[in-house]
UniProtKB/Swiss-Prot annotation:
This is Deoxyguanosinetriphosphate triphosphohydrolase. It comes from Escherichia coli O17:K52:H18 (strain UMN026 / ExPEC). CDD domains: HDc. Homotetramer. The keyword DNA damage does not apply. One of its GO terms (molecular function) is magnesium ion binding. It catalyses: dGTP + H2O = 2'-deoxyguanosine + triphosphate + H(+).
Length: 505
């Protein structure tokens, strides 16, 4: 096992215009303060205020959006980071681990990773992801990419259909089709901060949001040693070279994770479990009394000093005492949140320290709060009650189905841009309006300038005389559409769908 030295991980250099020379502790902290400013002031963060947490298109400001959720995760992440550093200081290990002059950057990287963790999520959350992937699967049929004979391939895009005698190109076709059918919010977050927004964050800060290490084009079995780290796509083919450079800069082995990402993940797990239940009460899906009984029933028999007793029952009893002039709901969730944090944060911090050799190496194949402990059971309890009584509620399911239809409908509306030939689309990009393509011209001009420029830049770097050019061009054209639609807020996507379907009231 390599020696633990966080100076080799907290890399303050950037991809472009990187600071040069040796830096003092204060100068390094200023570099990460610059990251904070870039992130907090980015439009992608502002858009989170109109993206779904659980309840799409919610008008009640007391119910969480992606932004308010991310701010809560940021605070919990800061709490865990401080707890870790405090315990390492007590153990006199800060200097031994190269952290004595990097405590500020350590905390800042965790906080900003937490704030950004949902930055790539599409409108309507996981149902938006599913809509994008299903729509592309119905046209690209990635499962046919291994088909024999090749005539069985049902891909509707000629450039990406497998052909006899073109095995090197066929392998690229397989990768592209697989990649495009595995849109994922975390992978889109990497693409957003590097390719689309050009935020030029430090290597360490980007490493903090590389939650999953599996490429989106992966087709084989995941290694048992990395099955958790690779359970979802973490980056796209379009960012392959950037991620390879990131791994080099952060001393990460293939498919390994940046150490501070485990803290961000734990903060998210702690935050959303309680928040989803609180939002459900705010939405009148159930009362606090009903929630308590759901939790009690799901946990089962327990001893007086059990974690359930110390966290949930304690919150319930204190909220019923009415010692404060606040509603039972407010008191219950205040105590539930405080009790949960006071138990889970120290536990997550100690798990991080206990497993630091594997975490530092990037190979710890678990979440900090997924084990055989009571703390893990408590999180599972919150999640299971939410799944059974919140996510399956008819109002929630109806909104999710509407969201799925909106995203599918928008992709269908913009489909003509994907149906144009390479030469015709190139002409449209150059001229912006082509008389013989009135519909396509209007659709193209509705795309955001940022996304169009990202497409142009990517295609301009391709060798136009290469037999791979038509494949890559189509890939980036699909990315253009995915970038545009996934970047919409819930409300904008809803309104845009109604406008373009001519159903606006």
């Amino acid at each position: 096992m390599a020696q633990i030295d966080f100076r080799k991980k907290i890399n303050w250099h950037r991809r472009y215009r990187s600071p040069q020379g040796v830096k003092t502790e204060h100068e390094i902290l200023r570099i990460f303060e610059s990251d904070r400013g870039r992130i907090i002031n980015s439009p992608a963060i502002r858009r989170l205020q109109q993206k779904t947490q659980v309840f799409p298109l919610e008008r009640n400001a007391a119910v969480r959006t992606r932004l308010t959720h991310s701010m809560e995760v940021q605070q919990v992440g800061r709490y865990i980071a401080k707890e870790i550093l405090s315990r390492l200081k007590e153990l006199k290990l800060l200097e031994a681990y190269g952290l004595d002059e990097l405590t500020g950057p350590f905390e800042s990287i965790v906080e900003m990773s937490c704030l950004m963790h949902d930055i790539g999520n599409p409108p309507f959350g996981h149902f938006g992801e599913a809509a994008i992937n299903d729509w592309f699967r119905q046209r690209l049929h990635p499962e046919d990419a291994e088909s024999q004979p090749l005539t069985d391939d049902r891909c509707s895009v000629a450039a990406l259909r497998l052909r006899d005698g073109e095995e090197p190109l066929n392998e690229l076709r397989r990768k592209i089709r697989q990649d495009l059918c595995h849109f994922e919010g975390n992978a889109q977050g990497i693409r957003l901060v590097h390719t689309l927004m050009r935020m030029n964050l430090t290597w360490a800060q980007v490493g903090g949001i590389l939650k999953y290490t599996r490429p989106a084009w992966w087709r084989g079995e995941t290694p048992e040693t990395h099955h958790y780290l690779m359970k979802k796509p973490g980056y796209y083919l379009s960012e392959e070279a950037y991620i390879a450079r990131l791994r080099k800069e952060l001393n990460l082995a293939l498919y390994s994770r940046f150490p501070l990402t485990w803290i961000m993940e734990a903060a998210d797990d702690i935050s959303y479990c309680v928040a989803d239940l609180e939002d459900a009460v705010e939405k009148r899906i159930f009362t606090v009394e009903q929630l308590y009984h759901h939790l009690h029933e799901a946990w089962g028999q327990h001893e007086k000093g059990s974690l359930f007793s110390l966290v949930v029952e304690n919150a319930w009893e204190k909220s019923r005492s009415n010692s404060l002039s606040r509603s039972t709901e407010d008191q219950f969730f205040m105590y539930l949140r405080v009790n949960t944090l006071n138990k889970l944060v120290p536990y997550a911090a100690q798990r991080f320290i206990d497993n630091l050799p594997a975490i530092f190496a990037g190979t710890f194949n678990h979440a900090l709060l997924e084990d055989a402990s009571e703390c893990s059971d408590l999180l599972k309890l919150y999640k299971n009650v939410a799944v059974k009584h919140v996510f399956s509620h008819p109002d929630v399911e109806q909104l999710e189905l509407q969201g799925y239809r909106v995203i599918s409908g928008l992709l269908e509306i913009y489909r003509p841009l994907l149906s144009l030939s390479l030469s015709d689309f190139t002409e449209l990009v150059e001229k912006e309006r082509v008389k013989r393509f009135p519909i396509e011209s209007r659709l193209f001009n509705k795309l955001s300038t940022r996304h169009r420029l990202a497409y142009v830049e990517a295609v301009s770097k391709l060798p136009s005389d290469s037999p791979e050019f038509p494949l890559w061009e189509y890939y980036y054209r699909c990315r253009l559409l995915q970038d545009y639609i996934s970047g919409m807020t819930d409300l904008y996507a809803w309104d845009e769908y109604r406008r373009l379907m001519a159903v606006e009231q």
